[in-house]
Amino acid sequence: MAFPELLDRVGGLGRFQLFQTVALVTPILWVTTQNMLENFSAAVPHHRCWVPLLDNSTSQASIPGDLGPDVLLAVSIPPGPDQQPHQCLRFRQPQWQLTESNATATNWSDAATEPCEDGWVYDHSTFRSTIVTTWDLVCNSQALRPMAQSIFLAGILVGAAVCGHASDRFGRRRVLTWSYLLVSVSGTAAAFMPTFPLYCLFRFLLASAVAGVMMNTASLLMEWTSAQGSPLVMTLNALGFSFGQVLTGSVAYGVRSWRMLQLAVSAPFFLFFVYSWWLPESARWLITVGKLDQGLQELQRVAAVNRRKAEGDTLTMEVLRSAMEEEPSRDKAGASLGTLLHTPGLRHRTIISMLCWFAFGFTFYGLALDLQALGSNIFLLQALIGIVDFPVKTGSLLLISRLGRRFCQVSFLVLPGLCILSNILVPHGMGVLRSALAVLGLGCLGGAFTCITIFSSELFPTVIRMTAVGLCQVAARGGAMLGPLVRLLGVYGSWMPLLVYGVVPVLSGLAALLLPETKNLPLPDTIQDIQKQSVKKVTHDTPDGSILMSTRL
């Protein structure tokens, strides 16, 4: 009796799976708030140099005449490229000649200017404080803001490697529990950090734990659910990220101080840490590592929750030993990472799949973590992204089963690229159109993620499938790390980041045309199967004569 049969006996889709899904997907909503938090906690408000005539009461007392703040601003700060007060320069001396009615640009163009030596004055009408206002991450220090976002995303990359190994060694539930604790502690500590480097350090630790939460949530959902119920619970898990986008915008709208906002999205993980102790460990993992007595206890516990206590009582250690012997071998028959790059039939699949994953992570996080550049109301924009993500993810599942994997993959990468490139031509004054294009583009990227997740699983043979998918996810996280840094090109022109964000998905989408279609094709089991496949049509019989087809979704 193999493990799937054991799971069917105790219930593979029942009350327990319902409770478990609610308990595990709820933290995913709050994980999304951590991922998207710096849209708000690192927002850049309007700012100008601190100047004595406006910001020093002693200097104001000595001003001759009755001059209003607009006049004092004009004589203290030169206009910037958009004819608004410059954000990074001020006059060394007040330019009183600018108060004359016939004053022109020539009246101040030769005047000496200097950087904001005494700091900045920020507009607090939208946010009481952000990390930008706390540590003056503007002007010459503006590169530190996207650097903080890249450090967070680097933490997810490192955490995925560490937590993946740890969960295989110590168990899914145990690593998940301590990941909850690390998120709560690191997030709380980050809210109180007095310096920017310490803030980045604790955000890095938080991100590494976030990776542990995401990975082990998916593992527990999959390993405690029957094959028939897995698509449902994994879809709910994916939709948790969509609703998390809406939650992020809602919480940020109500909490305008970055320290309190960081606390607000970290505190719930203390609760998740406490109740996670009552979640069962993966019985499949326990049996695989030889902990049969614990595996038996967990199976009987699940059977009781699913009202199948009688079936659970019939399970014995002998039955579990039989299940352990019948579990498929994990031996990959010599397949390794080098196999992906040195086998002709796999090389181009690996490279193009990695390019598609890279394009998704690069473009999505590059845009989604800089909503200020896409629209004026970032709270509404964040919520709209989540609302649009819901039908796109569910709709993409239907489209790929009808139109094919390759066509949908190409479309869901090229379309957002075109939306982003179109935004270059839209004037900044047309905020609604810019926001609509941004939401549509990010929504399509959500569809691209759904497609590439399924497509890449079907492109590679069973013996090396997880290695290939893991390599592709590394490419996605590497792209996510680089995405925010592209915004630094904005110093050469506001259109430069959008050009890069638009070109990358378009090129990767076109490259996906070189991949073979996998709709209704047999899933390859060995590398030899890949080498025998033609691009258009293959047939592959399993040893018992049946045909193992690719997944319908």
Swiss-Prot record:
Record CDD domains:
MFS_OAT
Glycosylation sites noted in the Swiss-Prot or TrEMBL record:
N56
Keywords annotated in UniProt: Cell membrane, Glycoprotein, Ion transport, Membrane, Phosphoprotein, Transmembrane, Transmembrane helix, Transport
- Post-translational modification (record): N-glycosylated.
Q: Where are the transmembrane segments?
A: 10-30, 146-166, 182-202, 204-224, 232-252, 260-280, 351-371, 378-398, 412-432, 435-455, 466-486, 495-515
Q: What is this protein called?
A: Solute carrier family 22 member 12
Organism phylogeny: Eukaryota, Metazoa, Chordata, Craniata, Vertebrata
- Which sequence positions carry the modification called Phosphothreonine? T542
The UniProt entry, under SUPFAM superfamilies, shows: MFS general substrate transporter (SSF103473)
| PROSITE patterns in UniProt | MFS
Per the record, its GO cellular-component terms are:
apical plasma membrane; brush border membrane; membrane; plasma membrane
Q: Which GO terms describe its biological process?
A: monoatomic ion transport; response to xenobiotic stimulus; urate transport
Membrane topology (UniProt): Multi-pass membrane protein
Gene assigned in the entry: Slc22a12
Q: Disulfide connectivity? A: none
Catalysed transformations (reactions): urate(out) + (S)-lactate(in) = urate(in) + (S)-lactate(out); nicotinate(in) + urate(out) = nicotinate(out) + urate(in); urate(out) + n chloride(in) = urate(in) + n chloride(out); orotate(out) + nicotinate(in) = orotate(in) + nicotinate(out)
Q: What does this protein do?
A: Electroneutral antiporter that translocates urate across the apical membrane of proximal tubular cells in exchange for monovalent organic or inorganic anions. Involved in renal reabsorption of urate and helps maintaining blood levels of uric acid. Mediates urate uptake by an exchange with organic anions such as (S)-lactate and nicotinate, and inorganic anion Cl(-). Other inorganic anions such as Br(-), I(-) and NO3(-) may also act as counteranions that exchange for urate.
